Amino acid sequence: MSGHSGHDVKYGRHRTRRSFARISEVLELPNLIEIQTASYQWFLDEGLREMFRDISPIEDFAGNLSLEFIDYDLGEPKYSVEESKNRDANYAAPLRVKLRLINKETGEVKDQEVFMGDFPLMTEMGTFIINGAERVIVSQLVRSPGVYFNGKLDKNGKKGFGSTVIPNRGAWLEYETDAKDVVHVRIDRTRKLPVTVLLRALGFGSDQEIIDLIGDNDYLRNTLEKDNTDNAEKALLEIYERLRPGEPPTVDNARSLLVSRFFDPKRYDLASVGRYKINKKLHLKNRLFNQTLAETLVDPETGEIIASKGDILDRRNLDQIIPNLENGVGFRTLRPTDGVMEDSVLVQSIKIYAPNDDEKEINIIGNAYIEENVKHITPSDIISSISYFFNLLHGVGDTDDIDHLGNRRLRSVGELLQNQFRIGLSRMERVVRERMSIQDMTTITPQQLINIRPVVASIKEFFGSSQLSQFMDQTNPLGELTHKRRLSALGPGGLTRERAGYEVRDVHYSHYGRMCPIETPEGPNIGLINSLSSFAKVNKFGFIETPYRRVDPETNRVTDKIDYLTADEEDNYVVAQANSKLDEQGTFTEEEVMARFRSENLAVEKERIDYMDVSPKQVVSVATACIPFLENDDSNRALMGANMQRQAVPLMHPEAPFVGTGMEHVSAKDSGAAVTAKHDGIVEHVEAREIWVRRVSLVDGKEVTGGIDKYTLRKFVRSNQGTCYNQRPNVAEGDRVVKGEILGNGPSMDSGELALGRNVLVAFMTWDGYNYEDAIIMSERLVKDDVYTSIHIEEFESEARDTKLGPEEMTRDIPNVGEDALRDLDERGIIRVGAEVKDNDLLVGKVTPKGVTELTAEERLLHAIFGEKAREVRDTSLRVPHGGGGIVLDVKIFTREAGDELPPGVNQLVRVYIVQKRKIHEGDKMAGRHGNKGVISRILPEEDMPFMPDGTPVDIMLNPLGVPSRMNIGQVLELHLGMAARALGIHVATPVFDGANEEDVWSTVEEAGMARDAKTVLYDGRSGEAFDNRISVGVMYMIKLAHMVDDKLHARSTGPYSLVTQQPLGGKAQFGGQRFGEMEVWALEAYGAAYTLQEILTIKSDDVVGRVKTYEAIVKGESVPEPGVPESFKVLIKELQSLGMDVKMLSADEEEIEMRDMDDDDFTNQNDAFNIVQPENAATEKTE
């Protein structure tokens, strides 16, 4: 090992890397898709049960019948994962629920098991299979339910406060101050009332009661003056008028309305997280910290004095009295009269002196520790939140920052599903109630009451069309993994792009170790869609936690005890960085340590440290942690680097990077694209499609062999993005494998590591200006040797339907098609597997009946003799679209007869898969891992590329001007280290924030026998002369991105037109034209190019008659006729006429031009070659 820095680390079975890490990892990375699998598991184990418990029992309006949910179980899924994909089905299991119907009059009890629909299951990879496609449910970041206080300035610059009590579902309660120092309340976003009205309605009727409760102060006096009610009943009526304007109020109605709005668990739900947050916020300790007591605290049981009047409660004193507070110090039982609640209310109240005036006493009230299982709001919550608001006005208590991750929580799959299921169940509940009152009570069974349609529909709607249920990004394993770890602030119940301001999107200090500050999309969603950090976990309340190493307070040593902290908890501690220097015992070597406290970065005495980071990469996400030398890149470019790695196309021959970060192995293993061993064992048999492993387990110290596990590998399957999904074995017969080890490489993997691109020889130099503006010049060797060749699989389908005129049929017998076009079709008219097809070739022959007139006797005779040919049919065959040519990989046929489930009206469905081998091409987009992207501008023959002194030509030339202004120097360090690694025949790992420094790079370069500045003389391949200066040449990892020129190239001569304006459609998918827009018209006007302009605006666009005649004229070789009136002009005139204006069109000699109607003969004649629109891409404009 001597002679170089770094040490060897083994990643998986086949790869060893020299790691430059200096910090040893204390904690293994967690399973990276746990956020999906754990949440779904919770839903199956507890979420479903919780929901049935909430809704059960359902009683009829009279209370005679009651339906209870007893138990449920999920059966076996109908199809396996593979089969669900092939059949376009859902991977789902039947949910059966055991119900009990109790007739209270007769005491009769009926039990029955009822089927409640098929419930989609999650695969082991954390995905769902819906209609045969893999989908991912993205976790949603929402505001946590709870009570929030925030400062606000009014228009005169006067400081005030606002406060909101936000439930999980139910009515909001908001408090605010106005310019006259009156405190108002809004119930459920209605008009505001003085806050004392709400207190009176709760049963504190007189002014004196309110003053005794809250404590005397100016704000309260102002509010009481503004309040024109003087007892509980008037207050109730006042509230009722606000909530139900226009209805005649009665006291009873008002009382029951308020009760149902806030104190009914079915209408108002805080969820356990809301109860937890409210108890935490309204606890007295936050407001007592550093305040002076204005009364003596006595233990109610023993009578001993805990703290005396005038004591200042610093942290130590406060910690001592907290247990006493929880035992009932300062508890007061209030007995409200005439209010909403009959019961007494328990609160906890303590008097302190105002911080700015030690004569004045303030009363602080807490909600007296309500049990976790009370999910609705209680009167004591309302009283304490009002008290907190008044305390804030006197400078006691804190306001909240809503962008802090302690106030934002995650709704993962399980909870999103639960909420959706609950909607379905509550719809079902209504139906059940109605049926209970209609049907005969004696004969009724649970089965007859239940209607599962709403439940099934709500689940289907969620998976099929929710904003959070997304088509999985399967471009490569990293894209797949990142998609499952994505956090979105959008979606139902979240933000919208337009409403989200700058603050929500910005990086917040509480994101540290929880959400990646780098990986987020560019564009309108920036900062709203984030990625989970590498070590983060989600706790039971949905808050993101990050691990820290605990520091022993006695010895000040860093222990290996790991605590997971939420953002709230972390706010109380001082946390040291992961790179702080420690000695063998785990003590800090320096007296002052760099540490974080809330949003500050400070140098702190080592005794004050509470925790220490686990790893330098705990800040960033998985994709960001795959960028070597991240610490040398500007963050904007790192963002592009992280995002572009997800768009890497899997290559035919992937190759792991020489310069990695050590994350390649973990991310490949956890992505779900690899085949991993489920048990320890010995490999018995390996072939391309299957691996057999004999299980081996230890029993009493002896090895015992068990059964065989068979692992099937997926070969050449189309991924969601049309890339090729292919798995290859990574083990040999006789290998011993352990549980979790990679048996087979997935796409973009090499030896069990992520391999998104290839290592190529790069020179930073210009070459005749061909790499201007980030363009890339490439050697032809990369094309010849298939270095950047990728495989793409496209799927085309054709269906035979029943039409009004008879069924369509698939056949070889197609009108007006020669035998040579049919040579690769079988007798059913379907292409054979292995055929090579070009644009516009037939894939599936299909004919559709035309409108059949009454046949004459002769026609019937012909029909009887010649069969199909004579019948009126039109050719609606499936043909290869432009740019879709390739080799037919597979054909799948689904028919009604064979028992396949097809949509209504479809008799037969044929899917054809065409595979293309795409070599790299001018116009393709490539990138490095540092956000250095570019388009290939020229592919030079090998002999023209500059070559090194030993004759090796370089592979790629990049423009050196792309580096300084972008400040992504990481690519230059990677280039040099990669060159040295290749020369030494090693792979290196340089983890983020803890990798090779400049000195390490130069010493490795010298070890490889290269010049210390790592530059070399290059010779011009054309002339053989040396270039004037030495040039940086090295090995860089370059990726081919999914933006390929073959997918973007598009040309049109004639094609479909929009129905209203008759202008050509736009976009490649619609086979549209190029829009010659307003500004382009100005350009031609500026040149006075009148004729060109005229034909662009008329016959090339929407002069319906003119374009047909022009087409004919061109075909027959005649001169082009005069253009007519454009259709869009007619549309304009019709619109003006529809507004009641009399608009006419006059010719030059002032004759009125008759506007011919839309259904002009020339235009409707469907037979002219020009206006035929294929029904598949019928002229409907797609709005993107």
Curated annotation (Swiss-Prot):
Statement: the UniProt record of this protein carries the keyword Electron transport: no
UniProtKB keywords: DNA-directed RNA polymerase, Nucleotidyltransferase, Transcription, Transferase
The name this protein goes by in its record: DNA-directed RNA polymerase subunit beta
UniProt-recorded Gene Ontology molecular function terms: DNA binding; DNA-directed RNA polymerase activity; ribonucleoside binding
GO BP, sorted A to Z: DNA-templated transcription
Organism: Listeria innocua serovar 6a (strain ATCC BAA-680 / CLIP 11262)
Catalysed reactions, semicolon-separated: RNA(n) + a ribonucleoside 5'-triphosphate = RNA(n+1) + diphosphate
EC class (word): transferase
A Pfam family reported for this protein in Swiss-Prot or TrEMBL: RNA_pol_Rpb2_3
Family: Belongs to the RNA polymerase beta chain family.
Subunit structure: The RNAP catalytic core consists of 2 alpha, 1 beta, 1 beta' and 1 omega subunit. When a sigma factor is associated with the core the holoenzyme is formed, which can initiate transcription.
Signal peptide residue numbers: none
Region named Disordered: 1160-1184
E.C. numbers: 2.7.7.6
InterPro entries, per the entry: DNA-dir_RNA_pol_bsu_external_1 (IPR019462), DNA-dir_RNA_pol_su2 (IPR015712), DNA-dir_RNAP_su2_dom (IPR007120), DNA-dir_RNAP_su2_hyb_sf (IPR037033), RNA_pol_bsu_bac (IPR010243), RNA_pol_bsu_CS (IPR007121), RNA_pol_bsu_protrusion (IPR007644), RNA_pol_Rpb2_2 (IPR007642)
Any GO CC annotation of this UniProt entry: DNA-directed RNA polymerase complex
Function, in words: DNA-dependent RNA polymerase catalyzes the transcription of DNA into RNA using the four ribonucleoside triphosphates as substrates.
